[in-house]
């Protein structure tokens, strides 16, 4: 008979200890250790066969046959883009996001799309009743006879339904509400989340079922529960977007079967999440040519995306001055301000600086450095920028402008939307001299920040 012992497990990182501690040694959080009863099993293998290998004997990697993995399209081009072309049968996808951001709406819409293609779909809800799911399905126009719904939180009962129905797609909403009866801890605890996820993954891989699992987030936007959950699943998708914005970004932070650089853009409407295939045109539809506003072509994976960077620089009598941005990392913003003051001799250190990206988009790539600097300098000098111009490039600490990747794709996207000129790194300019006829744009190659500002802000 298995012995029982008491352990204190951190609900944030999964660290366990036989005695209670106020501060978790693993993650440094306070009051996160919760008492859990753990069974000790003897002479039992704790390994998990995920069903990925056909043989347990070692073989040369050159003899391993590689075949194209079949994919199920989800009916959403944006979601398929993030997944790498669709979801693979036998894989497990974790979707994480703030409450009300659209996780359940997206998964229910995917279920309806698969059911319409003749696939058998099982939607397991642990947070709502089947009536509530039906009401949302009516609003999303996602009612189909092959879409089966059950309200269940007991993992053993869920496994029974899966074995009986043999669905092609399984959705569990959410993993924090599911529990195993043989584990004596509350649903959502580290032990429950870990063991339930492992069991769902085993069922999915054994039966070749594509599985979507919805997860909650903490107040700082990270996955609620143990980080080991992200290691168990095949793909982790994070929903981004404020409650005051109708646009949602779906970003892959882990993907065993595709790129982690792709993003999907959706618009939240009354009928659910709608794909936004031409996001650049949408984000620039309300732009005005004012000082401090510049267009920056960013790249997410293979997708060029034009965004409007806005900067406001104002004198302030208060010390220290404020630096505020929800769209750009603050440390990066402070670095660019220091470069402007040291290398371009702008007396910007005593000013309040506010930077944002229209549409609630967050930009992290270095190629946006030059655009941010130009926008701040334009606002500081109160001078308009060259009309119909895009700006991109990485800025070094010495004030030099460095080359970035996929410059041609950025220019082609800008030319498609009617932009006529671009300020870009000199090295990219030299590489693209012969491409001018292809883009139809006038290119300005800048070697340093001062030269870029001279091109972007011509004297009136």
Where are these regions (language model features)?
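Conserved Walker A/P-loop ATP-binding site and its immediately adjacent core
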Residues: 126-132
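Conserved RecA-like ASCE P-loop NTPase motor core of nucleic-acid helicases/translocases
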Residues: 121-125
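Peripheral, non-AAA+ core regions of ATP-driven protein-machinery
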Residues: 2-12, 16-83, 88-96, 101-108, ...
């Amino acid at each position: 008979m298995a012995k029982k012992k008491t352990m204190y497990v951190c609900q944030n990182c999964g660290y366990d200890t036989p005695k209670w501690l106020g501060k978790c040694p693993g993650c440094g959080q306070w009051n996160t250790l919760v008492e859990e009863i753990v069974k000790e099993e003897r002479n039992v293998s704790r390994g998990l066969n995920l069903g990925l290998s056909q043989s347990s004997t070692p073989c040369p990697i050159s003899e391993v046959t590689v075949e194209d993995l079949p994919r199920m399209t989800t009916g959403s081009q944006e979601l398929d883009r993030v997944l790498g072309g669709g979801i693979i049968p036998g894989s497990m996808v974790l979707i994480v996001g703030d409450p009300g951001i659209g996780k359940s709406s997206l998964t229910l819409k995917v279920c309806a799309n698969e059911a319409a293609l003749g696939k058998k779909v099982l939607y397991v809800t642990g947070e709502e009743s089947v009536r509530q799911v039906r009401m949302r399905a009516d609003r999303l126009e996602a009612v189909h006879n092959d879409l089966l719904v059950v309200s269940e939180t007991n993992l053993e009962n869920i496994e029974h339904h899966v074995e009986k129905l043999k669905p092609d797609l399984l959705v569990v909403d959410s993993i924090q509400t599911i529990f195993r009866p043989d584990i004596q801890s509350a649903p959502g605890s580290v032990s429950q989340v870990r063991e339930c996820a492992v069991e769902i993954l085993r069922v999915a891989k054994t039966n070749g079922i594509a599985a979507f699992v919805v997860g909650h987030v903490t107040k700082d936007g990270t996955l609620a529960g143990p980080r080991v959950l992200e290691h168990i699943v095949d793909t982790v998708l994070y929903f981004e977007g404020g409650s005051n914005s109708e646009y949602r970004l779906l970003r892959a932070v882990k993907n065993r079967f595709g790129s982690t650089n792709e993003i999907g853009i959706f618009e939240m409407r009354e009928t659910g999440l709608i794909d936004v295939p031409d996001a650049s045109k949408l984000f620039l539809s309300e732009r005005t040519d004012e000082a401090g506003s510049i267009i920056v072509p960013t790249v997410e994976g293979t997708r060029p995306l034009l965004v409007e960077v806005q900067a406001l620089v104002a004198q302030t009598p208060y010390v220290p001055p404020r630096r505020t941005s929800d769209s750009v990392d603050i440390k990066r913003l402070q670095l660019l301000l220091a470069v402007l003051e040291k290398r371009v001799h702008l007396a910007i250190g005593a000013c309040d600086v506010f930077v944002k990206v229209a549409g609630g988009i967050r930009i992290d790539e270095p190629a946006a450095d030059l655009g941010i600097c130009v926008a701040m300098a334009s606002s500081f000098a109160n001078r308009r920028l060259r009309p119909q111009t895009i700006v991109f490039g990485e800025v070094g600490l010495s004030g030099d402008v460095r080359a970035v990747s996929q410059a041609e794709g950025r220019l082609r996207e800008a030319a498609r939307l009617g932009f006529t000129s671009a300020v870009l790194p000199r090295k990219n300019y030299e590489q693209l001299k012969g491409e001018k006829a292809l883009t139809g744009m006038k290119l300005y190659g800048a070697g340093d920040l001062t030269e870029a500002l001279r091109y972007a802000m011509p004297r009136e």
